[in-house]
């Protein structure tokens, strides 16, 4: 007879068997999921230096770091991985032959924080290329062949902190990347060294806060030499910014196809850099920022009299705003002097001093300035109109001048005479003979009544009015005479 078996014992073994089978399945799945060309260690997959032409398939979904560097990858398509890798935070694709990246290639890795695309063959960065990487913090693109960067290539990357674009062929400075509060509000490092930048937006760079300029690397570029460039980098040197202090010898510019160090432009006769003071007028409202090299620092302001500036205005016109700036309301002359900002951070402390000069007068309002400008403009327009009228609308007397009528002898001028074109007589001829020529002597009469010789007044003198002569005789002051002589000497005609 067979012994009787209690079915309750079998039911007690089922949970243990199920747990054992689950552990075996999980262990087997982990072993099977690791690609043959990769080395797997927990959630790290290293597939580097395997000469892979494509990304391995069946990547584990729990992968946190994927190293595909030093392979033969040439294109990164949208379907490069069929598995959505939501836990992947680091992707290394350096030292491949990548020349194309799909705009949807990063959709399967939305939580990526570190992306290395350096040492490839990328030539352009198209719009919205990295828009799916909204939490990316570090992006390496150095040592490619990038010539063009689309203005929208880095849209929707509000968490990006470090961007490496050195050793490319970029010729346009991407100003949209460094404007405070623009596309990349947390960007603290932008490496544009060893490119083909010639011109920089110098006025815009001067306005950038120190924490951005501290990580803006521009060395090894063929910049155009000028004094404004020298002033810019001299200010950065004065502030001890890392982007200048770490690469002083590599900051050069081009002039006449020759390289010159930016800090040695004596041939341009650039003036020595001096830190400028803040200037204000009576009654102005002024904000002075504590321009630190790091963000998120605690700031304390001290007045020229070594008194701490409070957050709220108590006595006086100065206070500290919420962002640590010095706020002046209704500036007074006694507010002038040197103010000191003490900035304290977790790993870094900084001390800044700024000088304020207050002019003892007020500026004109905007309406006065506009009125003055309007008056000047109207005056200039009227002047131009008058000049045009004078040049083109002045009446010409010759147009309306009729046939000249002979005037009376009373209207003739008696202060000129005509030199006759009759041939000269022989002065050596004797006797009273005239040799067929009339000889007449004309005396110049005074120009007006009461004038004598040389314009001297002779009271009581009057001018005789000559009688009418024959019709064919030429008048003494004919306007058509060849010449007129103003002299008291008798002229033989």
UniProtKB/Swiss-Prot annotation:
Signal peptide: which range, if any?
Answer: 1-27
Ranges of residues in domain LRRNT: 28-61
Output compositional bias ranges, type Polar residues.
408-424
Q: Which SUPFAM superfamilies match?
A: Immunoglobulin, L domain-like
How does the entry describe the domains?
Answer: The LRR repeat region mediates homodimerization.
Q: Per its UniProt entry, which superkingdom is the organism in? A: Eukaryota
According to the entry, every stretch annotated as the LRRCT domain falls at 221-272
How is this protein named in the record?
A: Amphoterin-induced protein 1
Residue ranges spanning the membrane: these are 373-393
What InterPro entries does the record point to? Answer: AMIGO, Cys-rich_flank_reg_C, Ig-like_dom, Ig-like_dom_sf, Ig-like_fold, Ig_I-set, Ig_sub, Leu-rich_rpt
């Amino acid at each position: 007879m067979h012994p009787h078996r209690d079915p309750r014992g079998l039911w007690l073994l089922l949970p243990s068997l199920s747990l054992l089978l689950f552990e075996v399945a999980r262990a087997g799945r982990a072993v099977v999921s690791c690609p043959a060309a990769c080395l797997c260690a927990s959630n790290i997959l290293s597939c580097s230096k395997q000469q892979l032409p494509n990304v391995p398939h069946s990547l584990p979904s729990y992968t946190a770091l994927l190293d595909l560097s030093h392979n033969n990858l040439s294109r990164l398509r949208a379907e490069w991985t069929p598995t959505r890798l939501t836990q992947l935070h680091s992707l290394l694709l350096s030292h491949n032959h990548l020349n194309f990246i799909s705009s949807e290639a990063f959709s399967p890795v939305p939580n990526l924080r570190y992306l290395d695309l350096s040492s490839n063959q990328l030539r352009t960065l198209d719009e919205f290329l990295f828009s799916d990487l909204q939490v990316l913090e570090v992006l390496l693109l150095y040592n490619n062949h990038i010539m063009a960067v689309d203005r929208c290539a880095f849209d929707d990357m509000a968490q990006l902190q470090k961007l490496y674009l050195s050793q490319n062929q970029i010729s346009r400075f991407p100003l949209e990347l460094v404007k405070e509060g623009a596309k990349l509000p947390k960007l603290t490092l932008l490496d544009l060294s060893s490119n083909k930048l010639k011109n920089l937006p110098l006025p815009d760079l001067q306005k950038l806060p120190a924490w951005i300029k501290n990580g803006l690397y521009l060395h090894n570029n063929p910049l155009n030499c000028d004094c404004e460039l020298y002033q810019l980098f001299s200010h950065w040197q004065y502030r001890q910014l890392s982007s200048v202090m770490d690469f002083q010898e590599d900051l050069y510019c081009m002039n006449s196809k020759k390289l010159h160090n930016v800090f040695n432009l004596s041939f341009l006769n650039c003036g020595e850099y001096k830190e400028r003071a803040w200037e204000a007028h009576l009654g102005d409202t002024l904000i002075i920022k504590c321009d630190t090299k790091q963000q998120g620092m605690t700031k304390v302001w001290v007045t020229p009299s070594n008194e701490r500036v409070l957050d709220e205005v108590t006595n006086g016109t100065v206070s500290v705003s919420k962002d640590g700036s010095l706020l002046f309301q209704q500036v007074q002359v006694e507010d002038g002097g040197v103010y000191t900002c003490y900035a304290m951070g977790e790993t870094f402390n900084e001390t800044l001093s700024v000088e304020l000069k207050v002019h003892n007068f007020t500026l004109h309002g905007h309406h006065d300035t506009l009125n003055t400008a309007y008056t000047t403009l109207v005056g200039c327009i009227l002047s131009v109109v008058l000049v045009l009228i004078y040049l083109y609308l002045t009446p010409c007397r010759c147009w309306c001048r009729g046939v000249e009528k002979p005037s009376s002898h009373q209207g003739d001028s008696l202060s000129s005479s005509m030199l006759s074109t009759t041939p000269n007589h022989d002065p050596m001829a004797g006797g009273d003979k005239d040799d067929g020529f009339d000889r007449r002597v004309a005396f110049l009469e005074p120009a007006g009544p009461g004038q004598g010789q040389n314009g001297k007044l002779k009271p009581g003198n009057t001018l005789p009015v000559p009688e009418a002569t024959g019709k064919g005789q030429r008048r003494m002051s004919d306007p058509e005479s060849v010449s007129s002589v103003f002299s008291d000497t008798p002229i033989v005609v």
